């Protein structure tokens, strides 16, 4: 499904990004953590899959004429606000940014660690669910508390929806049980 993004005019004062999926009548919104400066991996992943011309198209669909230059400027502002601003609560810039293989900075939020690492050799039949469970456990170990599981599932659903395979209810339960099992092993 083609996903399009429409942002509120002033992202800095907004607490939501509004996503438009498929039909013009299909709307849903997602809260941005910490006043728009830190977002979950799901939103980052979605943003990285769309280009600034999607913003342009979305504005046109919304009845607001937009030039390509304006769309590019807005897209750059969005990327700056979401990915380059640091929060005062962050421990250090070194812990937030890691160098990837290409030498560019990759921002890592608490939810990004849930999805970016490979599962261990002990992988059950459904590696997708096992990976999600593993990342949840890693989050618990790293931050000393469990993430809001519903947020983790929602984040995973956004990523998976892009590929056409959202989690089913029974899969969510499987992940929850895997997390409990993995925690008991520790």
Swiss-Prot record:
Subunit structure, as described in the record: Oligomer. Interacts with host HNRNPK.
Function: Modifies the subcellular distribution of heterogeneous nuclear ribonucleoprotein K (HNRNPK) and may contribute to modulate HNRNPK functions related to processing and export of mRNAs during ASFV infection. Necessary for virus internalization.
Organism this protein belongs to: African swine fever virus (isolate Tick/South Africa/Pretoriuskop Pr4/1996) (ASFV)
Entry's Gene Ontology cellular component terms: host cell cytoplasm; host cell nucleus; virion component
Posttranslational modification: Phosphorylated on serine residues in the 115 N-terminal amino acids.
S-S bridge residues: none
Keywords on record: Early protein, Host cytoplasm, Host nucleus, Host-virus interaction, Phosphoprotein, Virion
Descriptive protein name: Phosphoprotein p30
Record keyword Protein biosynthesis present: no
